């Protein structure tokens, strides 16, 4: 089952299953997690996507896509400004805020298991949809 927390995963016993579930449901990449960490440390700041992109060492276009994903999952909000899109940490409810706080704690104490959990996630439907438009040679490769 997609997004299911494995009972035999090395992260078990280190990170609570509900935090694992939050990661699987809400965090699609290390870039998203690192963006949340930065924005959470200055929650009243509107961060231009170009600034976050620079700090995350990713392209601005990629950064906007990652941040838009966080908006859809209720973790940040966005607004259009003269300089482009800006984002601010603003979980849509207290439960999400609490889960982010817990994730920050476990990520700071168990970086590798959390990173492995994120990297081990099944590909998202968006990636699968994008792959459908990848040009292929006549032999299908």
Indicate residue ranges for each PLM-predicted region.
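Long, charge-rich, low-complexity intrinsically disordered regions
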Residues: 2-12, 82, 88-92, 131, ...
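Short alpha-helical segments that sit at the start of domains
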Residues: 5-34
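Short helix-capping/hinge SLiMs at alpha-helix to coil transitions
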Residues: 25-29, 40-45
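Short, cationic-aromatic polyanion-contact patches
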Residues: 26-28, 80-103
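A short acidic, leucine-rich amphipathic alpha-helix
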Residues: 35, 48-55
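Short amphipathic alpha-helical interaction segments
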Residues: 57-73
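A short, conserved structural fragment
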Residues: 71-83
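Exposed, interaction-prone assembly regions rather than primary DNA-binding/catalytic cores
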Residues: 108-141
């Amino acid at each position: 089952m997609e997004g299911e927390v494995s009972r035999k995963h090395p992260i078990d016993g280190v990170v609570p299953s509900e935090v694992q579930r939050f990661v699987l449901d809400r965090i699609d990449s290390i870039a998203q997690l690192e963006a949340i960490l930065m924005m959470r440390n200055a929650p009243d700041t509107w961060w231009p996507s170009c600034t976050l992109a620079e700090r995350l060492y990713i392209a601005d276009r990629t950064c906007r896509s990652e941040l838009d994903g966080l908006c859809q999952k209720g973790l940040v909000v966005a607004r259009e400004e003269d300089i482009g899109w800006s984002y601010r940490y603003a979980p849509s409810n207290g439960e999400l805020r609490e889960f982010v706080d817990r994730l920050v704690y476990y990520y700071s104490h168990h970086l590798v298991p959390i990173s492995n959990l994120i990297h081990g996630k099944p590909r998202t439907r968006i990636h699968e949809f994008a792959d459908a438009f990848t040009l292929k040679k006549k032999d299908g490769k």
